[in-house]
From Swiss-Prot:
One of its GO terms (molecular function) is rRNA binding. GO terms for biological process: translation. Residues 12-75 form the S5 DRBM domain. The gene is rpsE. With S4 and S12 plays an important role in translational accuracy. Pfam families: Ribosomal_S5, Ribosomal_S5_C. GO terms for cellular component: cytosolic small ribosomal subunit. This is Small ribosomal subunit protein uS5. It comes from the Bacteria.
Amino acid sequence: MPEQIDGNKLDLEERVVTINRVAKVVKGGRRFRFTALVVVGDKNGHVGFGTGKAQEVPDAIRKAVEDAKKNMVLVPTVDTTIPHTVVGHFGGGEILLKPASAGSGVTAGGPVRAVLELAGVADVSSKSLGSNTPINMVRATIDGIKQLKNAEDVAKLRGKTVEELLG
């Protein structure tokens, strides 16, 4: 299992993906609360997401940022892109991530773009294949990122050198 990344020691940038107002219906009317989905990253290979709920929007965002710092993952990169094509799944969400040539930028929509930009991936192409609910898209993207392995990791797992792998 990979080691835990301490989000408090990194210089993180945060991006609010969605804010949703939810209501609890009681005898006297509706009670409103807010949920926030936030992505944090250092644009240098570390990214995480979190959710928070509170009576007021700023409190929900603060809670989401704290949660995101606890859920950080490391993103393996090759130059400015990802090492290989991968499909991330979560619930009904499915995200296809493909490496892109240098200078092509992040071709992704909404929540996926936030995750990839804050992870520090400059060139990548993506396609949403399933549900486009923001939380499912973010979780599917993180799932795809967790599946990424660079050549050194694969060589180590197989007990070979990188040169033997690449032929």
